Amino acid sequence: MYNIKCLTKNEQAEIVKLYSSGNYTQQELADWQGVSVDTIRRVLKNAEEAKRPKVTISGDITVKVNSDAVIAPVAKSDIIWNASKKFISITVDGVTYNATPNTHSNFQEILNLLVADKLEEAAQKINVRRAVEKYISGDVRIEGGSLFYQNIELRSGLVDRILDSMEKGENFEFYFPFLENLLENPSQKAVSRLFDFLVANDIEITEDGYFYAWKVVRSNYFDCHSNTFDNSPGKVVKMPRTRVNDDDTQTCSRGLHVCSKSYIRHFGSSTSRVVKVKVHPRDVVSIPIDYNDAKMRTCQYEVVEDVTEQFK
């Protein structure tokens, strides 16, 4: 189960209810709550896990999983489904499986089966689970549900995201450049705290291993605190790392501040602007422990664009 800090229990329950109605896509729900699609997926996955029966097994058991899933046939009468061109939701014996064109390679085939009233086949297609017994690429090794970098096991929110993407059949290798960039950070505390920032689920990782965050600035693009740093689109803003406070118990202190989407609504004024910034994981110095790990202090970032209209 995922620990989702940026949404209340009631908000998560409402997301599950609306998504199950078939009237909203994951992206629409993400825009509504001001979070990422990853957050919505985790909410839905938690809901699925909560419905599954708990089984206790004792004794010595050996299990071997490969990429070909064996699925028991299901009776048509046990299947409830909703579908559109943008999403599919199929419930079998109280367990719900969701798919979108971006998350399931067989989306169109499943949709065609539902339209043709071939519910058993559609349920089987959407329920295919893929697992990798062993994966090795460069310094990264995934084995037995664990990730190792240079033979050292890593446990973190980032690792959870990689393993989750692998389970869904998504491109989990996309995260490796980010992992390598992160390990360039000289602060072990910053590395660990950045994983907490990722768990906030508002973080978009780029192909070159950076990540996007957000910043509230004045109407003239200068920073709100000192009015000395120009945050106009295209600018690279930086300061010596040694001048950034690395104490994550201090909320407001020295450093270049950026935040997640969920923090934007708690800050700024009617004349403020919001800019999207690109940050190298190496340049993260500290993440204050308040506000659900939703903001951080860095020593450098690049301003990508003005996104004020997205937050109105």
Swiss-Prot record:
Give the highest taxon in the source lineage: Viruses
Q: What disulfide bonds does the UniProt entry report for this chain?
A: none
Biological processes, Gene Ontology terms: DNA replication
Q: Which GO terms describe its molecular function?
A: DNA binding
The main place the protein resides is: host cell
Entry's localization field: Host cell inner membrane
**Keyword set, alphabetical order:** DNA replication, DNA-binding, Early protein, Host cell inner membrane, Host cell membrane, Host membrane, Membrane
Any one cellular-component term (Gene Ontology):
host cell plasma membrane
Record's function text? Transcribed prior to replication. This protein form parts of the replication complex and has DNA-binding properties.
From the Swiss-Prot or TrEMBL record, give the protein name.
Answer: Protein rIIB
The protein's organism comes out as Enterobacteria phage T4 (Bacteriophage T4)
